[in-house]
């Protein structure tokens, strides 16, 4: 069963559906005939005079319970957004419970003393809106939006989830499971790995630098969630922002009514370790074997939220990496063709923020791209940008600002962010004017003060066997794995596990699966195994097919040696969104040849294959097809090197028995081993029966909501 290929195609389909829709619309527009004599301007029109940005006036107040309140009357749309922010973010969580704030935020809308999770969702949807809660480093926020005429209903629900959440035990378990799945996805995604490593390296043991782990998530109990809620979800010091088609008088009266009886002050934040003071630049290499690209994230601590340097730094960031017309993008992509994009940004939490420059580059140019990024940082520090470059950045930022405060939700977010950071009342209304007033001298002084390359944290996620040498030429390199554990250079070429295949478990049969996307049947997949002969050799032939709603069709045949289970042939064909895809691979010992033509988000990969692999390397599709032949047992773990023809790389795939599960699918109920396969483009969980006949009852992508469920088996 070619499950890896099926999952790859399913994931590409879910992600690409919107992209194909946009492409179709674009093509339809392009086919509209134009007049024969149509003339197109050769120069952009001159800029019109800048119109003043009219920020709506707002009213401040304080409720009897100590909630600070800001009301912004904005009557352009008949909607309203209400945000309640409380000092209850990650900074308030003990290190051994990292992730607790996110679970509490997730659970606030999952049940109260008078409403179930479904009732909360239905009531808010009935008001023409939505409700959500999330946490960041410093704050926990609950936001509800609705039609303005339904503000009372929305406010009552908001107050209920804040004041009367019950944290049902089943919901706690589900939230923890979702967080563990999210962690699995993070540990498989280079961008997320870079962000996790960067935060830890910059902030150290400070709460801003902590990453939740499997251990901290599993340690979180319902009692922990309830205790955190009771200690920190309190009115005194909270901020309520209401923006939309409302009157201040109505909002004040309603807020006092719905929050009546809410009392208390939150527990203070625990003492936190100091942020490390960096004295030199270090490169941290996060080894991801088989990666075809490298993710670079470089930066340093920068400013606190009330530093007036925010205005020149906003302009400097726009010049350096704030868009497709910025230096990093133009040089690394347009001039060098090293990446699809390179950008920069800086953060402003309640404490110390950071500057970050990032790019995802081709593996062979990793060191060159990093060197160029550092050169551009030095250039910005040592050479004040030209007047024309400054003017272009200012014009964009000043002209774009009104677009960021158009809707009630945008206004509420902007006002809340400013107030929570302790910024003055005129910060948002006058932000644009202060940007426009920045002088060239102020910009140069800020660049000289903040931008540096001699005290940086540089994180590179990529295949250490291919990029370590180049990185060493740029500076000191420390190697870690995906979880941040130290690695030695010798660890970059870990030896695969010797697998004692139980070939007798591979019995000829046919299987049918339904493909579920977000709980809805979207298509069908089939697979079959048969014994055959090729000359004097006995082989196993595994065929599979998949159809996803007519958007994707795929057929695969994998042939392996019946005695050794070594790969012999792979044939894959089909189409995705109208694009043909095919893969032909032939294995002769350690030598593989063939051709691939596979659509991807970066375009079509069309390439000949002619490469020599290490002894014992499997085809990744063979590995997934043969999982039922592993001698599965609690805690069992294997690592094999597998060739991925889609990308043309060898990746170490791991299969780990992570537990037991009872699985009910249309074909019946089965007692299964849960086997987590990682190391590919994304993690996959397989549910394999514990007793004969050994089969895959279900398999699922971790992250994207795609599940394959067994519906029938013959014989």
Label the predicted regions:
Residues 70-72, 76-106, 115-162, 176-180, ...:
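M16 family metallopeptidases and their MPP-like homologs
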Residues 19-32:
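Bacterial N-terminal signal peptides
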Residues 498-589, 634-715:
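Acidic, serine/threonine-rich low-complexity disordered tracts
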Residues 1-16:
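N-terminal secretory signal peptides that target proteins for export/translocation
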Residues 371, 375-379, 548-632:
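Contiguous hydrophobic, core-forming segments of folded domains
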Residues 160-167, 258-266, 375-384, 474-482, ...:
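A common structural junction motif
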């Amino acid at each position: 069963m070619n499950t890896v290929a099926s999952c790859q195609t399913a994931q590409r389909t879910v992600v690409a559906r919107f992209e194909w829709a946009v492409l179709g619309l674009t093509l339809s527009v392009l086919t509209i005939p134009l007049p024969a004599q149509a003339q197109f301007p050769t120069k952009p029109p001159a800029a019109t005079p800048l119109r003043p940005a009219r920020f709506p006036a707002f009213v401040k107040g304080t409720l009897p319970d100590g909630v600070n309140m800001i009301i912004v009357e904005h009557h352009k749309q008949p909607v309203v957004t209400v945000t309640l922010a409380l000092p209850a973010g990650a900074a308030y969580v003990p290190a051994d419970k990292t992730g607790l704030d996110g679970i509490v935020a997730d659970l606030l809308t999952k049940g109260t003393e008078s409403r179930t999770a479904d009732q909360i969702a239905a009531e808010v949807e009935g008001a023409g809106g939505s409700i959500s809660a999330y946490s960041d480093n410093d704050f926990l926020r609950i936001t509800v939006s609705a039609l303005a005429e339904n503000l009372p209903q929305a406010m009552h629900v908001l107050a209920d989830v804040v004041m009367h959440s019950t944290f049902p035990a089943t919901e706690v378990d589900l939230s923890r499971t979702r967080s563990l799945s999210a962690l699995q996805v993070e540990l498989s995604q280079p961008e997320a790995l870079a962000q996790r490593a960067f935060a830890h390296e910059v902030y150290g043991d400070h709460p801003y630098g902590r990453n939740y782990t499997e251990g901290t998530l599993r340690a979180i109990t319902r009692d922990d969630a309830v205790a955190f809620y009771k200690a920190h979800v309190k009115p005194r010091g909270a901020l309520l922002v209401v923006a939309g088609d409302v009157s201040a008088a109505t909002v004040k009266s309603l807020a006092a009514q719905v929050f009546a009886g809410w009392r208390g002050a939150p527990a203070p934040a625990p003492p936190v370790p100091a942020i490390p003071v960096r004295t030199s630049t270090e490169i941290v290499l996060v080894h991801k074997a088989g990666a075809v690209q490298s993710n670079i994230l470089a930066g340093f601590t920068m400013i606190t939220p009330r530093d007036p340097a925010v205005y020149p730094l906003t302009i400097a960031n726009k010049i350096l990496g704030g868009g497709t017309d910025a230096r990093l993008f133009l040089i690394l992509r347009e001039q060098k063709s090293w990446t699809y994009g390179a950008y920069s940004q800086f953060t402003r939490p309640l404490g110390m923020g950071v500057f970050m420059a990032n790019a995802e580059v081709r593996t062979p140019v990793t060191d060159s791209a990093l060197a160029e990024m550092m050169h551009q940082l030095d250039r910005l520090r040592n050479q004040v940008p030209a007047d024309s470059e400054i003017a272009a950045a200012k014009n964009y930022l000043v002209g774009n600002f009104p677009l960021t405060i158009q809707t009630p939700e945008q206004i509420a977010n902007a006002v809340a962010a400013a107030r929570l950071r302790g910024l003055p009342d005129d910060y948002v209304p006058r932000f644009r004017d202060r940007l426009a007033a920045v002088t060239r001298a102020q910009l140069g002084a800020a660049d000289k003060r903040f931008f540096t390359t001699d005290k940086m944290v540089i994180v590179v996620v990529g295949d250490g066997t291919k990029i370590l040498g180049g990185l060493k030429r740029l500076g000191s390199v420390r190697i870690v794995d995906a979880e941040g554990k130290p690695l030695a250079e010798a660890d970059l070429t870990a030896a695969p596990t010797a697998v004692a295949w139980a070939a007798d478990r591979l019995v000829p049969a046919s299987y049918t699966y339904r493909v579920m996307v977000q709980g809805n049947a979207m298509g069908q997949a089939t697979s079959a195994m048969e014994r055959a002969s090729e000359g004097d050799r006995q082989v196993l032939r595994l065929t599979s097919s998949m159809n996803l709603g007519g958007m994707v069709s795929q057929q695969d045949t994998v042939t392996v040696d019946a005695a050794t289970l070594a790969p012999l042939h792979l044939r894959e064909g089909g189409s995705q969104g109208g694009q043909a895809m095919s893969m032909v691979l032939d294995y002769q010992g350690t030598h593989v040849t063939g051709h691939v033509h596979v659509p991807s988000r970066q375009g079509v990969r069309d390439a000949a294959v002619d490469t020599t692999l290490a002894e014992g390397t499997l085809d990744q599709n063979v590995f997934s097809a043969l999982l039922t032949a592993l001698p599965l047992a609690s805690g069992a773990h294997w690592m094999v090197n597998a060739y991925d023809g889609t990308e043309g790389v060898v990746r170490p795939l791991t299969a780990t028995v992570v537990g037991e599960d009872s699985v009910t699918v249309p074909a019946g109920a089965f007692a299964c081993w849960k086997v987590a396969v990682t190391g590919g483009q994304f993690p996959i969980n397989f549910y394999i029966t514990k007793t004969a006949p050994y089969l895959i009852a279900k398999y699922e992508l971790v992250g994207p909501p795609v599940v394959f469920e067994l519906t029938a088996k013959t014989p």
